[in-house]
């Protein structure tokens, strides 16, 4: 599995601010959007270009570069992933949205999809999953599996922070996906929280506890 930890100073600086215990909902939400925007820029750097002809401002046909082939659908994992969508839209405003919601089954401890609203022609699109945290990897693996079952063949993932344990688990289950993250953190604690992590990103984005 391709894993890219973004080392850009602006990404690291903004992520550092997000780790503060005193951060406000407004600030956390703003930084989530800004970092997601920077990560989306990195993800799309590998997209191919092709030449196309348009009518230029001077009234003559001119040749321009345009992104080739597949269009994009952004896939937020509910609910925290919703806070990352605007960062993607800054670069790909026409992206369609496919939403996935997961809950953990108390008996099996496995993630179960309680909601899935996917766009059409997934096999012709790049699916960009967004979720602030990759902890154990369970929800992410289930989301990737759901997308593949629906026809998706090109899947990329953006997270703000990722645990090594979650990366390893995801790589074993889906070695063909790509992960772009602002930070590979130290480890998971005994409660499966990422350390040093960000705390509960969903609560901090939506101002709940």
Curated annotation (Swiss-Prot):
Pathway: Pyrimidine metabolism; UMP biosynthesis via salvage pathway; UMP from uracil: step 1/1. GO terms for molecular function: GTP binding; magnesium ion binding; uracil phosphoribosyltransferase activity. Uracil binds at residues 194, 199-201. Its cofactor is Mg(2+). Its EC number is 2.4.2.9. Catalyzes the conversion of uracil and 5-phospho-alpha-D-ribose 1-diphosphate (PRPP) to UMP and diphosphate. It catalyses: UMP + diphosphate = 5-phospho-alpha-D-ribose 1-diphosphate + uracil. Keywords: Allosteric enzyme, Glycosyltransferase, GTP-binding, Magnesium, Nucleotide-binding, Transferase. This is Uracil phosphoribosyltransferase. Allosterically activated by GTP. Gene3D superfamilies: 3.40.50.2020. 5-phospho-alpha-D-ribose 1-diphosphate binds at residues 79, 104, 131-139, 200. PANTHER family: ADENINE PHOSPHORIBOSYLTRANSFERASE, URACIL PHOSPHORIBOSYLTRANSFERASE, CHLOROPLASTIC. The keyword Transferase applies. The gene is upp. Belongs to the UPRTase family. GO terms for biological process: UMP salvage; uracil salvage. Binds 1 Mg(2+) ion per subunit. The magnesium is bound as Mg-PRPP.
